[in-house]
């Protein structure tokens, strides 16, 4: 049996291309088309270590939802009860671990103050780093969004996000200029003024050599009112890219995220991403985008690219929340904020395993009889 296989198409990318897509490099060019934001950087090394460490130490801020029930004992540990009766050996281990943790108030107080000032200025913010936003970590906040009303929510989101970890550790892994991969990079924290986005009205546009390869709905759920608006969206997107982006952005190949809110008379620039496999192709595949049989038509002329929308209600899709693969039980989240809770969770886990083992042994004995 003969089977045709589509060869994996290489997507060459250089470090310079990825750096060009850094928020601080394109935001000044298109500021009037973007949500209001402030950039803090370069970030101190202690802050990067803080985000990379296992677990996170939450500052005991006044009026903070995340520390109001915690008290500081003589060992400077956060706990909701005294540990006088705890095992001394375990206490010594925990104390050593706590001392190793980075404390924002002690290790980067100036950055801590800057973040608080921006939150006070805007009321609420949505954080991101050089390239990525912690969309995969919204499960850790009570509102299940990236809306941060206080500084501890910023810390929790960034620390829990795999996307942020990728920015810090693997941003240049796909670069073909291998030597440049080893160069260090300055990191920055972006705090966007919070505004509500209707996820149905955000679109991802793939551009290669200044030509549109395809447009994809950003949120992969079905919205029945989108399809009748496709022609309007297409015109707005093409005009915006042709008039505002192509002549000002230095790269010819990139991926851009745009938001078109009602009444559909303005386009917001949300993000610019590298034209590389690290960027999610959403309703396309990278091989599909790169192996089109016919050349695409320049922007402004009759289009021959696809504008892809979810065409029908997918019950299975709605049952699976976006980024659910990154979510964990709330017990684990709470335990990560408190060494005492970690001990309690571990003990419960051991008890469950012991109970399961006893039940299996009992079942085995019954079968033998």
From Swiss-Prot:
Q: Which GO terms describe its biological process?
A: eukaryotic translation initiation factor 2 complex assembly
Quote a single Gene Ontology cellular component term: cytoplasm
Q: Which domain of life does this protein belong to?
A: Eukaryota
InterPro entries documented for this protein: CDC123
Q: Which residues does the record give as Mg(2+) binding sites?
A: 271, 273
This protein's record includes keyword Magnesium: yes
Which molecular-function annotations from GO does this UniProt entry contain? ATP binding; magnesium ion binding; protein folding chaperone
**Family designation:** Belongs to the CDC123 family.
Task performed by this protein: ATP-dependent protein-folding chaperone for the eIF2 complex. Binds to the gamma subunit of the eIF2 complex which allows the subunit to assemble with the alpha and beta subunits.
- Supply the name of the protein: Translation initiation factor eIF2 assembly protein
Its gene is CDC123
